[in-house]
Amino acid sequence: MGGISSIARLGVKGLKSILQDSVPEAIQKIPTKVKEVAPEVAQKTQRSNTVPTYKKAKELLNKKGKTLDFGAGKGLGAKEIKADTFEPYAKDWKPDYNKSVDIPTESYENITSLNVLNVLQKGDRDQAILEIGRILKPDGTAIISTRGSDVLEAAGTKGDEAMSIITSTGTYQKGFTPDELVGYTQDLLGPGYVVEKVSGIGKAAIKIIKVSKKYGGRIMRDPNKNYNEQRAI
């Protein structure tokens, strides 16, 4: 699927640098013991046939504000929805950002990341989600999708995680169920974010809203936001 990125090669040093400048100290303690993936291998997962999926995702985003495609792959989906781009290993085109640390904190009202997380091993995947949370503006919306059990249809060897595989071409794939993706993301981001399932965008997809208002020490939902499960048209 499109939007798949090779950001798995950020590596431990790069991830620590991102964390030191970008996220709270408590989050910096999350382990990042992951193997680096050569970009020429991870780039094999990039696809150019997912423009319709981007159109569906756009229906769930805020109508106003800037959009960032996080892990833009070939950049075709971002072009369709007029989004800025983050892609560390772009080939034959120039993204707006090739290092996530260069993206300002709380700078985008909307973020898409379609079928990116499923090609990342857990340490890098955790950091990608934390970066999306950091970059998202208060009341901003992020749409994330991943593959599901279909990843196991590829030839390869079983990975360390549930529903994961190392393919015969050397790429990593981790499938999610919708409920698993919600729980994993919510636990990682914490109570400052609302994470809900959405349907119509791949095997598993979620909508993240960054909560902005606090009253009496309790985080409250914006009454003007619709937090119910939504379906892409």
Locations of regions flagged by a protein language model:
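Hydrophobic, gly/ala-rich membrane-insertion helices/peptides used by toxins and envelope proteins
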Residues: M1-K35
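A conserved beta-strand element that flanks and buttresses the S-adenosyl-L-methionine
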Residues: T112-N115
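Class I (Rossmann-like) S-adenosyl-L-methionine-dependent methyltransferase catalytic domain
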Residues: I30, V34-I103, T141-K213
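A short glycine-rich, Lys/Arg-flanked "PGG" loop and its adjoining helix->strand segment in the class I
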Residues: D126-T141
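Glycine-biased, low-complexity coil/linker segments
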Residues: M1-G2, Y215-G217, R221-P223, E229-Q230
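A short His-aromatic
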Residues: N118-K122
